[in-house]
Amino acid sequence: MILQGKKVIAIGDRDGIPGPAIEECVKSAGAEIAFSSTECFVUTAAGAMDLEIQQKVKDAAESIGADNLVVVLGGAEAESSGLSAETVTTGDPTYAGPLAGVELGLKVYHVVEDELKAEFDEAIYEDQCGMMEMVLDVDGIKEEMNRVRG
């Protein structure tokens, strides 16, 4: 179980899966929301994670602890999702924000990944994410997330 009993940082995407949709899914899997946000990844520099969100992630990791925290992304594109995943694991690859050079090593998944979907209430996932899943490059996102996680 990835989510059961964990605190989740939900980072949604205006053009992908928004934060509130991720929240509903992860709550159905027995997780608690540490914080949630909906970003516009194409609005930020080169798809990098917003600097304010980086600080919130850093603060949450310090107060909750990396072992009790899971980041769930909702990015519309594989590349921006990968950048966000890298940011919360090995540090900000753009060296622009509070996580530049900071290896938090957080567990990170995209909401469309099978490992997470298996834990969600199926009806809630379908209601919250089903339509967007049809237009996202799910295979590309899964490949990128697996690449980042190694």
UniProtKB/Swiss-Prot annotation:
Keywords attached to this entry: Oxidoreductase, Selenocysteine
EC number: 1.21.4.2, 1.21.4.3, 1.21.4.4
Top-level EC class: oxidoreductase
Active site, per annotation: U43
GO CC annotation, single: glycine reductase complex
Catalytic activity: acetyl phosphate + [thioredoxin]-disulfide + NH4(+) + H2O = [thioredoxin]-dithiol + glycine + phosphate + H(+); acetyl phosphate + methylamine + [thioredoxin]-disulfide + H2O = sarcosine + [thioredoxin]-dithiol + phosphate + H(+); acetyl phosphate + trimethylamine + [thioredoxin]-disulfide + H2O = glycine betaine + [thioredoxin]-dithiol + phosphate + H(+)
Presence of the UniProt keyword Oxidoreductase in the record: yes
GO molecular function terms noted in the UniProt entry: betaine reductase activity; glycine reductase activity; sarcosine reductase activity
The protein's role, per its UniProt record: In the first step of glycine, betaine and sarcosine reductases, the substrate is bound to component PB via a Schiff base intermediate. Then the PB-activated substrate is nucleophilically attacked by the selenol anion of component PA to transform it to a carboxymethylated selenoether and the respective amine. By action of component PC, acetyl phosphate is formed, leaving component PA in its oxidized state. Finally component PA becomes reduced by the thioredoxin system to start a new catalytic cycle of reductive deamination.
HAMAP family associated with the record: GRDA (MF_00826)
Family (UniProt): Belongs to the GrdA family.
Subunit description: Monomer. Component of the glycine, sarcosine and betaine reductase complexes, together with components B and C.
Protein name: Glycine/sarcosine/betaine reductase complex component A
